[in-house]
Amino acid sequence: MMSSAVWQRSKAAAARARILGSRIGSIILILLWSSPGPALDCPAVSRTFNPANLALAAVTAFFLLFPLTLGKPGLPTHLKADEGAYYLAAQSLAFDRDLRVEPKDVDRAFQEFPFGPVNNMIVMTDDGWHTVYFAKPYIYSLLGAPFARLFGANGMLFFNMPMTMAMVWMGYLYLRRYNPPGLAALFSASFFLLSVGFSYVFWIQPEVFNMFSVAACLFFGLPRADETGLPDRRRELLLAFLSGAVLALAVYNKPMFAAVGLAPLYAHLRDRRWKTLGVWMLGAIVSMGAIAGIAVKLTGHPSAYLGVQRQGVTLCEPGKVPITPEIVKARMGGGGGGDEDGAKPSSVPNSTTGNTWTWLLRSVDVTPYEEAENIGYFLVGRHTGMLVYTPFAALALIFFLLRGRRRAGELWVLLGSVTVVGLYFLTFIAWNWQGGGGFVGNRYFITAIPAFLFLVQEIRPPRLLLAGYVVAGLFLAPLLFTPFGAPVPEPTLQAHVRGIPFRFLPLELSLRNVPGYERVSIDGLRIVGRKDVFAPQGAQMWVGGGTQVELYFIGEHPIPRAVFQVTNFAPGNHVEIRMGKAREVLDFGGEETRRVSLDPGEPFRVRRQKWATFYVYRMVVTSRTGSVKHWVRQYPPNNCPTFVQDDRTNENFFTGVALAYLGAGAQLDADLYEVQWGNTVAPPRVRAGEAFAVTTRLFNQSRFPWTADGAARVNLAYHWLDAGGKQIVEDGLRTPMPWPVPPGERVSVQQKVLAPPAPGSYILELDPVFETVAWFSQKNGGKTLRIPVEVLPGGSDAR
């Protein structure tokens, strides 16, 4: 009898183990073909075959194999954002079992990504750069290291894919408790695959890893309403331990996500399951302790990211660590700031808390207006809006409010927790809450998105799912079908927002690091436009032809009136300019210039920040056609001479019109042309075609200042006359005023002049010009300064 009882208990224990193995196995995607039991609400579901399981298994198989087929080197061509540190750390752990940055680690980067330097790889030291470590939180790299060893960079993407599909399965198993299996599978797959989160599968960064940690925490930790009576005690404790332990993985990367754990903790506290609560806490502590302990073993610190000296560096060539004590000493001493090849580590911007452990305790530096503005962007922003980039998370919230609001207090705690996490980002890093310069959607908050699925109980009415597919089709398709970036002019991670639907969403003007935009300052205004359709050229602003171009004018004062000089290049062009309530329509026959005056009325937006108030005006320029214009793109100095880079390249731009902002227009009618010439010195003889300088001194005898900036400014210029006084060169080189010249003041300028190409006797006629308006001589009766100059043949002695 005793042996029989023992056998029965062993059999029961084995059965419980099989059930637990089934749940855990679904997370790691060991797909079980045993038929599951039916959902509570669906007694008619077949016990022998479940099409939902087969569908998810097929989708899982496809996505699991896809990352392994990517050709290397080539797809993608380079490491972006923080990928360099995470991937090379995984390689170092896989092959060297350490996190030290050594020449062999640099070699590995160029084996798969040989087409350019690896930028902004974050490293750290605690001994003056004698020993260098990878400085990103290491746990993602550690767990992905076996896959990186087997498959290289593709292995890290493969590592991301099982976690993504595990989230789909967890969502399916959770939703099946309350819904038919087919509907549960459809919603879960749509939630995770039709989301910007799926784009991060193709990033060698921990976003998917963190999402998986949050999803697994809630899957294991929330009460299971499909179970009758009290669950098996040991099973309950094991699930609680796993819930706390797996959340620690995300918390190590981003501590604020510890708030997600409040939901299961509340449920255990409410039900007075003190032991379960304690085991949950124990799981979190043990997991975090193990993670920190391994970090100490590898780097000497609980975190390689905090409490250390941290730096961003560029990998320029194989076999060479780009930062050493000698390089740092040279930089600190002003000795060049780079190694012998010019590779200069770029400093990582520090917050007010630097790299210390107190970085979570920043001071609040945001006004209520900015907070409200950021909340709006957070929900529907063009680059970050949650409702746009994760449409099924929005549907999950709707289903929760419709069907789940009276059922479980822990779900309200969960909603409050993720809300607090979102508000933390918006409040304490109000200028960078989207995730820095390398992001799609909201990279920081994407970790919390799986929590929204666990708010759902009944998916009713199911027809609401169609809204999610409509939003995904309009806004996510361009992003999801180009996971490695789109081949577009002016390539950027944000290229997807150039589609028509995104025009109706607000641009996040509060964020500093949104790539893909030109930002120029003209006449006290900051003007922002997309790089592919906006090309500032000095005082002129070229806007793209055959399309609609959106520009933002941002200044500290309202703009009651805006005057523009509009230059058309294409014959038969039809141009419409809208700014606020003002609208101008221009029809051009050919190349010509016109002046338009716009009264925009109320600003598009008033941004009330802590230190200033900014007035924002939105302009939309639509050109029917355009003309190809040429310009020269200049590049910053090449810090990686191993890779050849041109200092400048010739570029093409399909230009609709060129705009020159002339201010409010009041100064355009100012009589500022009275001038008195001072002692001006010019060489009596110059060589043909030679550029030379004239020391020009003049007094402003008018009642108005001579402006030195903006399109309508005063420049020094000249004409060339022949010996008989006939003008042979009208528009000479421009020399800007060094500063605004008030009435009655004198200015002395080294004026640039270019000699005529042919030898002979000439007269240099100095004549200031009020740009876009008139030459001074046209308004003051011809008060120019004429200087005889002998132009000698090229190569002659011009002394």
Identify the residue ranges that each predicted region occupies.
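Specific aromatic-rich, kink-prone transmembrane helix
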Residues: 170-173, 209-230, 239-247, 264, ...
